[in-house]
A protein has these predicted regions:
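N-terminal DNA-binding module of tyrosine recombinases/phage integrases
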Residues: 1-23
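N-terminal core-binding DNA-recognition domain of tyrosine recombinases/integrases
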Residues: 15-30, 34-115
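DNA breakage-rejoining catalytic core of tyrosine-based enzymes
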Residues: 110-127, 181-191, 205-208
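Basic, Lys/Arg- and aromatic-enriched nucleic-acid-binding interface segment
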Residues: 124-154
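C-terminal catalytic core of tyrosine-transesterase DNA break-rejoin enzymes
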Residues: 145, 250-287
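Conserved tyrosine-mediated DNA breakage-rejoining catalytic core shared by Y-recombinases
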Residues: 159-196
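Catalytic-site neighborhood detector that most strongly recognizes the C-terminal catalytic loop/helix
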Residues: 180, 279-304
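Active-site/catalytic core of tyrosine-dependent DNA strand-transfer enzymes
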Residues: 189-245, 249-255, 261-262
């Protein structure tokens, strides 16, 4: 069944649940319905899931990461999760019990659009690399390098297979298929990426994913990376900033800020630098890129 057909099938199931719902105000009902309708579109496009009763924790984790990539606030993400659980509770025979927010293993941190500095310090990054080395997690080391020095999203890192890695080494550039199937080219500008690509290629069977062990679902491998950061976060973050909560996605912010600063320092105009960073990140909307450049004064396309 085509994605569009699957989507309509899921919405039909949602409509049946909604018709029998007598709880909540009209506003809440509408808000929850629209939230789960968007979730249906995601399930159809990314999982080809045909029954809402088969929704599980892995779908929630994946969807949360997707919403965060879209720049959605923590309150919006939490409301959407509440909506999904609300309708899940209305199902007669759900296959799985959905985990709570604390059990997802994904940080639902507070975000203030275009204001919050989410970049990592060199010390924080170096310490986490050290932890990954100590635990011999070479796949985590490569993922961290790809995010920090090439701006890749976490799912873009874990999607990489041997063919993509070989092409990157040949061309000295990463060909990245991002959200919506949009392809972008990101030059490899740090030798450590090349080094780790070569090391993992030597250990990975041809045709397999570089950062995902055989037999392990990709979403579980991604969750493992998230948990690794959460586990070590308190020991690597600045102790004078107890509320600081670094995330993998913050490395993308670090890449954007450092790239923008480097381009402007090299003589490029702020406007041109902004659009260059936007293209490298795989974004088209200036306001979204502004979020990534929150730590850089003048990083806005408007020159604010």
């Amino acid at each position: 069944m085509a994605t569009k057909g699957i989507y309509y099938t899921l919405v039909t199931q949602l409509d049946k649940l909604a018709r029998h719902n007598r709880q909540g105000s009209f506003r809440t009902k509408d808000r929850y319905y629209e939230a789960v309708k968007r979730f249906c579109a995601y399930l159809a496009a990314h999982y080809h899931l045909q029954k809402l009763e088969n929704v599980s924790g892995k779908h929630l984790v994946s969807y949360v990461l997707y919403l965060q990539e879209q720049g959605k606030s923590a309150s919006t993400v939490k409301t959407d999760l509440s909506a999904i659980r609300f309708f899940h509770d209305k199902m007669s025979h759900p296959r799985y019990t959905l985990p709570g927010n604390e059990e997802l293993g994904v940080a639902l941190e507070r975000r203030r659009f275009g204001q919050q500095d989410r970049t990592w310090t060199n010390s924080e990054f170096g310490k986490l690399i050290g932890r990954a080395m100590a635990e011999e997690r070479e796949e985590y080391i490569l993922a961290l390098y790809l995010a920090r020095y090439a701006g890749l999203r976490i799912h873009e890192c874990f999607r990489m297979d041997t063919a993509a890695a070989e092409r990157a080494l040949r061309e000295n550039a990463l060909t990245v298929k991002g959200k919506g199937g949009k392809v972008r080219i990101v030059p490899i500008e740090d030798d450590r990426i090349t080094m780790m690509l070569e090391r993992l290629l030597d250990k990975t069977e041809r045709g397999h994913k570089l950062l995902v062990p055989d037999g392990v679902p990709t979403d579980r491998a991604i969750n493992g990376m998230q948990q690794f950061i959460i586990r070590h976060r308190d020991t690597i973050c600045d102790p004078t900033a107890p509320d600081r909560r670094i995330t993998f996605h913050g490395l993308r912010h670090t890449y954007a800020a450092e790239k923008y600063t480097s381009l402007v320092s090299g003589g490029m105009t702020p406007l041109d630098a902004h659009f260059t960073v936007s293209r490298l990140l795989g974004h088209e909307r200036p306001d979204v890129t502004d979020i990534y450049l929150a730590s850089v004064k003048g990083g806005s396309v408007r020159g604010e």
